[in-house]
């Protein structure tokens, strides 16, 4: 029983947030901190490369950044049929930012919490995208961008028509249209948030469960834990990249749908 409680306590400790209080309106400080750090890493790397960019023989980092920019720009050109001067940088930022936040999950699960413990911090969850409040924050930003691009494309009157006269073009059915279209609109940010959160939370939990194997006084279990940790980390590289790509891709597609939606 003691071992079970110890295991349960270990898992619970790693799933607890560093927060401002116990009320409903508390803030997850660790999610906020690592989100800012991830964004700062992206800005630092790309701004440094941009300042040192040369038309001559490029450095390896410049080649990497140029490949990333060209790749994202190609995706935006194929999927967003409107002015791309803001959507391209937005897509690049989303992909890199989400990828860096996801990649924090590859750090050994005990390293950052133990480091924080040295400074008197009891709880710390380092993966912002494994926190539903973090992914909802990202998706709410996308939600407002969808509304912005719809209004920019159709005007306020066109925006109202989209959600009151579709799919049934009759004044008496405006409440039905509004209900249907509102659900469709709200489903976009909700699905974005929960898809990213679900995958990253599951990945984080698997790492924690594998780490529990190291607590056993059994050489076979410890050895199996090392093998499983390495195997899952290699597979998880694909997961974190794919989830960043899906979030970025769906954002571009949703913005394109809002911008190019046909009049009814």
Swiss-Prot record:
Cellular component, GO annotation: plasma membrane; proton-transporting ATP synthase complex
Places the protein is found: Cell inner membrane
Gene behind this protein: atpB
Domain of life: Bacteria
Entry keyword annotation includes Transmembrane: yes
Family: Belongs to the ATPase A chain family.
Protein's recorded name: ATP synthase subunit a
InterPro entries: ATP_syn_F0_a_bact/chloroplast (IPR045082), ATP_synth_F0_asu (IPR000568), ATP_synth_F0_asu_AS (IPR023011), F0_ATP_A_sf (IPR035908)
Keywords: ATP synthesis, Cell inner membrane, Cell membrane, CF(0), Hydrogen ion transport, Ion transport, Membrane, Transmembrane, Transmembrane helix, Transport
């Amino acid at each position: 029983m003691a071992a079970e409680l110890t295991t349960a306590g270990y898992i619970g400790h790693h799933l607890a947030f560093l927060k401002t209080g116990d009320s409903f309106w508390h803030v997850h400080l660790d999610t906020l901190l690592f989100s800012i750090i991830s964004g700062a890493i992206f800005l630092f790397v790309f701004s440094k490369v941009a300042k040192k960019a040369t038309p001559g023989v490029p450095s390896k980092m410049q080649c990497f950044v140029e490949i990333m920019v060209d790749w994202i720009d190609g995706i935006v050109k194929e999927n967003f049929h409107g002015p791309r001067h803001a959507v391209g940088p937005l897509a690049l930022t989303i992909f890199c930012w989400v990828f860096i936040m996801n990649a924090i999950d590859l750090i050994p699960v005990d390293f950052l919490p133990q480091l924080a413990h040295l400074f008197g911090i009891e709880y710390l969850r380092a993966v912002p995208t494994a926190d539903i409040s973090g992914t909802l924050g990202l998706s709410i930003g996308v939600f407002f961008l969808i509304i912005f691009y719809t209004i920019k494309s159709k005007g306020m009157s066109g925006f109202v028509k989209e959600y009151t006269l579709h799919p049934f073009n009759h004044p008496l059915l405006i409440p039905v249209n509004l209900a249907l279209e509102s659900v469709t609109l709200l489903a976009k940010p909700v699905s974005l948030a929960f898809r990213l959160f679900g995958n990253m939370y599951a990945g984080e939990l698997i790492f924690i469960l594998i780490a529990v194997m190291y607590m056993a006084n059994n050489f076979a279990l410890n050895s199996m834990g090392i093998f499983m940790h390495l195997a899952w980390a290699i597979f998880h590289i694909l997961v974190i990249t794919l989830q960043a790509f899906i979030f970025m891709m769906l954002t571009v597609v949703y913005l394109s749908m809002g911008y190019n939606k046909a009049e009814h």
